[in-house]
A protein has these predicted regions:
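Generic low-polarity alpha-helical segments
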Residues: 1, 18, 26, 54-56, ...
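Structural detector for short beta-strands of small beta-barrel domains
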Residues: 2-49
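Short nucleic-acid-contacting surface segments enriched for D/E, G, S/T with interspersed K/R
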Residues: 67-87
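OB-fold (S1/OB) nucleic-acid-binding surfaces
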Residues: 41-67
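Intrinsic disorder/low-complexity segments enriched in polar/small residues
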Residues: 5, 35, 41, 80-83, ...
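OB-fold/S1-family single-stranded nucleic acid-binding modules
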Residues: 89-103
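Beta-strand secondary-structure signal
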Residues: 34, 51-53, 83-85
Length: 103
């Protein structure tokens, strides 16, 4: 993922998180996990996006779905036990990419 693409993906998050995320992007501090996530909707919407979080062993990671329909689709897939590959920024814990793992 290019730095420019990563910077576009952090828009809409709180400014404090964006500031930390910019450092993560410059340092290429990306992490990837493969899990069956438990999605939790967070407070607030931003121009029809849905903010959500996923609990990992070491805390929460935060993401945005483009619409409520996208969020429900991901949530339903996870409920069925589908494994997702998630790339997120190490310190800011913002999800850059999330996709269902295809075996």
């Amino acid at each position: 993922m290019t730095r420019e693409t990563a910077k576009r993906k952090i828009k809409g998050f709180p400014f404090a998180m964006q500031s930390i995320a910019k450092e993560d992007i410059e340092n290429r501090a990306y992490k990837t996990v493969e899990i069956v996530p438990l999605f939790e909707m967070e407070d607030g919407y931003y121009q029809m996006t849905v903010n959500y979080r996923i609990k990992l062993d070491d805390g929460y990671i935060h993401g945005k779905a483009l619409s409520i329909e996208d969020f429900i689709k991901m949530h339903d897939e996870a409920e069925r036990g589908e494994v997702f590959t998630i790339m997120y920024l190490e310190k800011s814990r913002i999800i850059l990419e999330i996709e269902e793992k295809n075996d």
